[in-house]
Amino acid sequence: MAPRLRRNLSTDTDTNTTAAATAVATLERPATADAQHTADAQHTADAQHTADAQHTAETAETRGADGAAIRIRGLRRTFGNHTVLDGLDLTVASGEFVALLGRSGSGKSTLIRILGGFDGGISGEVLATRQRSVVFQEARLLPWTRTLANVTIGLSGRDVAERGRVALAEVGLAGRERSWPVALSGGEAQRVALARALVREPDLVMLDEPFGALDALTRIRMHALLQQLCRRHRPAVLFVTHDVDEAILLADRVLVLTEGRLSLDVPVDVASPRRRTDPAFDRLRSTLLAELGVDELAEGDH
């Protein structure tokens, strides 16, 4: 059965995610109690919104779309006189892993924010599965809340704690339920963010450069973990990255976003296990780098 989708993601938000449309990158602890309360409420709302982006309110039209997790037609988003997304068309099938490449400012993160319900002011048709989660480059954990509570934020039911423990075990953090976020490494914090996304059993997971701030060895480990989790849970994945090799290693299909539209859409026809020494890998890398306007000698920048 095709998944049910919903239209016009920017129309309304669930009461659990009200007043948290923008991200809080860094929070400095205020000096006064009133300021503390205000900042805590904002950070809590932001983490809640990150965890529960899939709970955008229903509109009148809800329908299937031939097994698609995402279907976008003519999406346009402008900021003042600047057009970021210009008539974008995109379909992502249920269970498909799609990587999205593009230069800085090409609209990749804007697209993720629209699909996650963080950004409005759009025109065009945007459909996405009702159960969806977002993982950002920053883990966005509440620093004054223990790991398990960060994973289960916004959930209810008698089995919530057990579901959270299972999710943490899946990402290799069994026994860390009572750890404070400050005690976690960067890789561990991103594992918690993955657990928080997957504990909701989403049909669609969107990842916006989730491993960009990690060291090379940790990135390799996170690649293996993400592949394992995707095989187990089978969500559709929209994965934003600047790393061409990362896109080829992980995805079924790679897209390039240029000036608000998809300029390239190619399948990853590279045998598994994928190796950078494979001629097919090298050919696809060259194609993608050329589309991005990057000299292969500078590919490390991507």
From Swiss-Prot:
One CC-aspect GO term: plasma membrane
Pfam family, one: ABC_tran
Documented EC number(s): 7.6.2.14
Residues involved in ATP binding: G102, R103, S104, G105, S106, G107, K108, S109
Annotated SUPFAM superfamilies: P-loop containing nucleoside triphosphate hydrolases
GO MF terms, alphabetically ordered: ATP binding; ATP hydrolysis activity
Residue ranges, compositional bias (Low complexity): 30-57
Region (Disordered): 30-65
Keywords assigned by UniProt, alphabetized: ATP-binding, Cell membrane, Membrane, Nucleotide-binding, Translocase, Transport
Cellular localisation: Cell membrane
Annotated membrane topology: Peripheral membrane protein
Family: Belongs to the ABC transporter superfamily. Aliphatic sulfonates importer (TC 3.A.1.17.2) family.
Protein name in UniProt: Aliphatic sulfonates import ATP-binding protein SsuB
Record organism: Frankia casuarinae (strain DSM 45818 / CECT 9043 / HFP020203 / CcI3)
Taxonomic lineage from the root: Bacteria, Bacillati, Actinomycetota, Actinomycetes, Frankiales
